[in-house]
Amino acid sequence: MAQNGYLVPADPSAVVTVKKKTPQASWALIDATGQSEPLDVDKYEIMHRVQIHARDLRILDPNLSYPSTILGRERAIVLNLEHIKAIITSEEVLLRDPSDENVIPVVEELRRRLPVGNASHNGGQGDGKEIAGAQNDGDTGDEDESPFEFRALEVALEAICSFLAARTAELETAAYPALDELTSKISSRNLDRVRKLKSAMTRLTARVQKVRDELEQLLDDDDDMADLYLSRKLSSASSPISSIGEPNWYTTSPTIGSKISRASRASLATVHGDENDVEELEMLLEAYFMQIDSTLNRLTTLREYIDDTEDYINIQLDNHRNQLIQLELVLSSGTVCLSMYSLVAGIFGMNIPYTWNDGHGYMFKYVVGLTGTLCVVVFVIIMSYARYKGLVGS
């Protein structure tokens, strides 16, 4: 700023203050043990950490509008489902905007359910119980063989399906009474209320439809589902090393084998399995596809109910319009008859001298009576003809 003709340099501390207020991406990191920690890092650190491209990370930008997407990459799953924006790897989950009120329950659910596959790390610490745990491990090891990324994906799908189902239930609770009230009493307030509910239903239907379409697209393509098997791809990359060390673990030290987590055993098993086998993921996606499809069916039923209500209201309005037209016909017919009466009165009321106007005062009542009778007869004829043609009284 110029003062007395001199340039005054800007305050450098003010510039530093502005730089400190630059917003950074907010993330939450949840590992396989269920521990979570906040991460305030930029997009380049995220890209380097999970090895994804910038275009994939751009999908998770809350300032940009992207449809619901589930992308499988080499070492990560990019998940964009409404407010749930996450990056899932074979060992951890990066969740966007963890302080959002809709995301906080997802974080808590991830912390609760992700450590299930690693529960065997905490067992077998007694002196004589370790070998027994190793022997019984074969019986309990098959209870939860889902890889880490599938458990995280299941939490996200369950959260978004439950969220959309809850929004649908709220909409149904408000919509059905409003529609019933509108059918009984058509008013501007009720019409505006139903209009807002219909707009909300249209937006919610579009959101549910996007999630359903994404799940359907995944189920239709086995290659896309195979890309989501991160543990299998990671195990396949390290299979030569694993195949050498694996026999010694089980033959020499059963106690070490008892400490191997279920997720690790599942990863080792997939090394020798069919890489095109996507049955486990297909069953997982089908369950939530049916759930989201049920939500969409509820919205479709609500839309049909709204359409039926609109048709009923239109029928009522058409009926009222027909009644108004009938009333207009009656009034028009009466006006024609009165105009005939006025015509006679106007003829006799003209100020024109004629001889037979004198000495015939007794004719006034006959003229009035005959003219009125003629008008009534004409009105009855018009209304009878209209009723015969079905224009009135139907």
From Swiss-Prot:
**Which spans are transmembrane here?**
329-349, 366-386
Q: Keywords, A to Z?
A: Ion transport, Magnesium, Membrane, Transmembrane, Transmembrane helix, Transport
Any one cellular component term from GO for this entry? plasma membrane
Q: Where is this region: Disordered?
A: 115-145
**Family matches, as Pfam families:** CorA (PF01544), MRS2-like (PF22099)
Stored PANTHER family? MAGNESIUM TRANSPORTER MRS2-2-RELATED, RNA SPLICING PROTEIN MRS2, MITOCHONDRIAL
What is this protein's name?
Answer: Magnesium transporter MRS2-2
